[in-house]
């Protein structure tokens, strides 16, 4: 897309050289300084031609944000130390930060640069906790503590408030956001805003008793959806169920039956198609001159124990931008903020299938969604909707899992369908580039094992009940050999084995393609021309599904998602409504999934909705940070631990938002997410603060809403050069 100049031509130096500026954030000056030939002086009052005006306008340089000259900060002529560009590390980690390899450092040496692998955020708890038996009871009539004198927690409420708990926060007007929204605070005396919902009352004997206050009117507010909890959360798995999963008390009969069939079928195929023989005591061996006819293969085929259940029909369209699954950044408060701003579909952070099967609390917690994610998406009245789609039964939130073995993915899918039924889709991650995930055989490693991937998706589709199955892939693992076209054809029609057995496609309802290889990571721009090729292929395959079907044995309708239509989404570098419209119109995708662009500026969904650039003021942007703080306290709690957790995730987010250069400061639009700006200042102090790459400024921003950091709080961002520890 052509870049459009926004301002009057900048005045060049008298020596006809482009002004030189030191660059920040890893932007190189190697390709930015160029010598211009001397121009003929123009006669006074001579008309300015379009060519002269274009020549005089500042040139857009690839990789460098075109900040207007008046906002560029001139550095001193003395050589400045160069900061390492840590954005690629951070962007990679946004895909699977919690699953990276924890490499041990050499003894006696502590690295001060590079990625933080095993990240430590310190402690943020009360000096001495309040006993749960006292947390919600009136001061003089507490519940009985089963530990009695052996209890290690404080039993005197006034002593706890005076000596062990930090002073109340004064932000948000000193009013607890949870109490203000719901009429009660689930953290009682431990709340950092307890003064707003606690009072003293006089008892019959004249003593003053501390009691908690509730607002009965606010408590009567009903959830948006009937299956949400009182706190507005859906898909909250009980502790009893997590323990039952961990102890294998919750059975997965469909998965067990399907996996038994899959194992037998796979061995039969290996024997008949490739001459490999399996027995209990020996490895498979290749037989000589094995030739089996198609009829013999189909005769040996055993039907699966059951067919997939009929799936809910899906819809993806130009009016339904999706927020990509994002590890760490894709937490519930951030998804909730993006939903407010127009995101129509959201996904959980990537959960590991094996961890779900083992009942790990942290992994099952990723399935929680806010009630605003459990309402139907907004779609156009003139949308081209597949037959049978019911918008009233649709919702916005889906789960994403990763697995390296079929049984991991299939069992996890059955458990998700049983314990968290309010999911739009279950998406299989086949794009994660992180080394540890790749080496384990999950994520993008599955791109090179397409037969295995097809088995996984077919099995997931078989056991997911009514929940559709989708998949997210990359263009390939290596730059020299992209294989997404071949894979997409296989996922749409079925591979060689399924063709031989005439069992139809694996049942994928939608495919999302990230336009980069694993090898590229985020070092290059997404390849939307390749995405367009894949979109054209999907369109042809959707049109010809009936033609390639064996008319002798028509597949059951339950094996065909959306009546045979596979949706196709593109992903990569969408940073404005112009990018979105270009991808919809020129790449031919059904919808676009937005990842980093939404982290850096979540109002990109609002731009897509309104079809225009939105030059948000610093005050408006700070209001989004405030909203995130409220949503964070609502999610993680308003006690000391919850405030610390909210601060940690807010800092993670601010490490991305500081990359945003306001569009009012740019010479050219549209902005490019890959561009790195020179040192710049904002239109006011707050705008400059929000764009600061200094972690100390990020801490200041969190303190505007969460008060001073706990004395034991640490912040270890994705890159070690930005680490923070309390001083003193």
Curated annotation (Swiss-Prot):
**What top-tier enzyme class does this entry carry?**
oxidoreductase
Answer whether the UniProt record assigns the keyword Membrane to this protein: no
Q: Where does FMN bind?
A: 325-327, 400, 472, 514, 571-573, 595-596
Q: Where in the cell is it found?
A: Cytoplasm; Nucleus
Q: Which residues form the active site?
A: 432 (proton donor)
User: Which cysteine pairs are joined by S-S bonds?
Assistant: none
What this protein catalyses is: 5,6-dihydrouridine(47) in tRNA + NAD(+) = uridine(47) in tRNA + NADH + H(+); 5,6-dihydrouridine(47) in tRNA + NADP(+) = uridine(47) in tRNA + NADPH + H(+); a 5,6-dihydrouridine in mRNA + NAD(+) = a uridine in mRNA + NADH + H(+); a 5,6-dihydrouridine in mRNA + NADP(+) = a uridine in mRNA + NADPH + H(+)
Q: Which cofactor does it need?
A: FMN
Where does this protein have compositionally biased stretches of type Basic and acidic residues? 14-24, 33-58, 117-127
Zinc fingers classed as C3H1-type: ranges: 125-158, 175-200
Q: Which GO terms describe its biological process?
A: mRNA processing
Q: Known Pfam families for this protein?
A: Dus
Say if the entry is tagged with keyword Transferase: no
Q: Name one GO cellular component term.
A: cytoplasm
GO MF entries: flavin adenine dinucleotide binding; mRNA dihydrouridine synthase activity; RNA binding; tRNA-dihydrouridine47 synthase activity; zinc ion binding
InterPro entries tied to this protein = Aldolase_TIM, DUS-like_FMN-bd, tRNA_hU_synthase_CS, Znf_CCCH
Cite the EC number: 1.3.1.89, 1.3.1.-
- What segment(s) does the record annotate as region Disordered? 1-133
Which domain of life does the UniProt lineage start with? Eukaryota
Q: Which UniProt keywords apply?
A: Cytoplasm, Flavoprotein, FMN, Metal-binding, mRNA processing, NAD, NADP, Nucleus, Oxidoreductase, Repeat, tRNA processing, Zinc, Zinc-finger
Extract the signal peptide range. Answer: none
Family, per the entry? Belongs to the Dus family. Dus3 subfamily.
**So what does this one do?**
Catalyzes the synthesis of dihydrouridine, a modified base found in the D-loop of most tRNAs. Specifically modifies U47 in cytoplasmic tRNAs. Catalyzes the synthesis of dihydrouridine in some mRNAs, thereby affecting their translation.
Give the protein's recorded name. Answer: tRNA-dihydrouridine(47) synthase [NAD(P)(+)]
């Amino acid at each position: 897309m052509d870049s459009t100049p926004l301002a009057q031509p900048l005045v060049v130096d008298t020596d006809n050289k482009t002004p030189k500026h030191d660059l920040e954030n890893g932007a190189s000056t190697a390709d930015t300084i160029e010598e211009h030939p001397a121009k003929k002086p123009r006669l006074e009052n001579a008309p300015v031609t379009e060519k002269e005006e274009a020549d005089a306008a500042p040139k857009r340089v690839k990789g460098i944000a075109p900040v207007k000259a008046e906002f560029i900060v001139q550095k001193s002529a003395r050589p400045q130390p160069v900061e390492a560009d840590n954005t690629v590390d951070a962007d990679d980690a946004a895909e699977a930060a919690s699953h990276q390899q924890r490499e041990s450092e050499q003894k006696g040496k502590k690295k001060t640069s590079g990625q933080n692998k095993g990240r430590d955020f310190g402690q943020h708890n009360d000096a001495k906790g309040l006993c749960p038996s006292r947390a919600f009871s009136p001061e003089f009539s507490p519940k009985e503590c089963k530990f009695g004198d052996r209890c290690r927690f404080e039993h005197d409420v006034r002593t706890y408030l005076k000596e062990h708990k930090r002073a109340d926060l004064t932000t948000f007007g000193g009013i607890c956001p949870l109490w203000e929204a719901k009429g009660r605070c689930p953290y009682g005396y431990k709340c950092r805003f307890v003064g707003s919902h606690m009072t003293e009352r006089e008892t019959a004997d004249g003593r003053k008793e501390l009691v908690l206050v509730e607002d009965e009117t606010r408590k009567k507010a009903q959830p948006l959806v009937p299956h949400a909890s009182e706190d507005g959360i859906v898909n909250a798995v009980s502790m009893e169920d997590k323990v039952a999963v961990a102890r294998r008390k919750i059975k997965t009969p469909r998965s067990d039956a399907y996996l038994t069939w899959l194992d037998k079928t796979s061995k039969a195929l290996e024997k008949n198609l490739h001459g490999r023989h399996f027995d209990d005591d020996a490895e498979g061996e290749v037989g000589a001159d094995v030739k089996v006819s198609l009829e013999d293969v189909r005769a040996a085929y055993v039907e699966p124990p059951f067919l997939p259940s009929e799936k809910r029909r899906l819809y993806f369209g130009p009016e339904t931008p999706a927020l990509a699954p994002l590890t760490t950044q894709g937490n519930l408060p951030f998804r909730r903020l993006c939903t407010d701003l127009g995101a129509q579909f959201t996904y959980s952070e990537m959960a590991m299938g094996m961890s779900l099967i083992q009942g790990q609390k942290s992994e099952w917690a990723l399935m929680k969604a806010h009630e605003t994610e459990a309402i139907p998406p907004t779609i156009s009245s003139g949308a081209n909707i597949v037959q049978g789609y019911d918008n009233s039964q649709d919702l916005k939130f889906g789960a994403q899992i990763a697995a390296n073995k079929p049984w991991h993915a299939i069992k996890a899918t059955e458990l998700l369908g049983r314990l968290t039924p309010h999911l739009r889709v279950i998406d299989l991650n086949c794009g994660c580039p992180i080394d540890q995930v790749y080496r384990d055989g999950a994520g993008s490693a599955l791109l090179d094992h397409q037969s295995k991937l097809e088995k996984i998706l077919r099995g997931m589709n078989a056991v997911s009940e009514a929940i559709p199955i989708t998949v997210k892939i990359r263009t390939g693992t290596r730059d020299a050999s992209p294989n997404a076209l071949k894979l997409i054809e296989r996922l749409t029609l079925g591979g060689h084995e399924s063709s031989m057995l005439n069992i139809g496609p694996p049942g994928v309802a939608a495919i999302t393609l990230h336009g980069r290889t694993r090898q590229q990571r985020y070092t290059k721009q997404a390849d939307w021309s390749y995405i367009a090729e894949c979109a054209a292929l999907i369109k042809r395959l959707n049109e010809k599904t009936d033609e390639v079907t064996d008319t002798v044995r028509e597949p059951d309708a339950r094996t065909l998602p959306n009546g045979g239509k596979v949706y196709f989404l593109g992903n990569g570098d969408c940073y404005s409504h112009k990018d979105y419209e270009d991808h919809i119109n020129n790449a031919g995708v059904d919808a676009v999934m937005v990842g980093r662009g939404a982290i850096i500026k979540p109002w990109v969904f609002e731009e897509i909705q309104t079809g225009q650039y939105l030059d948000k003021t610093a005050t408006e942007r700070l209001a989004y940070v405030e909203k995130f703080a409220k949503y964070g306290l609502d999610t993680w709690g308003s006690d000391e631990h919850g405030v610390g957790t909210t601060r940690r995730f807010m800092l993670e987010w601010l490490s991305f938002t500081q990359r945003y250069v306001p569009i009012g400061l740019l010479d050219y639009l549209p902005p490019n997410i890959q561009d790195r700006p020179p040192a710049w200042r904002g239109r006011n102090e707050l705008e400059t603060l929000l764009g600061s790459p200094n972690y100390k400024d990020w801490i200041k921003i969190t303190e505007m809403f969460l008060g001073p950091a706990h004395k034991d709080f640490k912040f270890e961002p994705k890159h070690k050069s930005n680490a923070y520890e309390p001083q003193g």
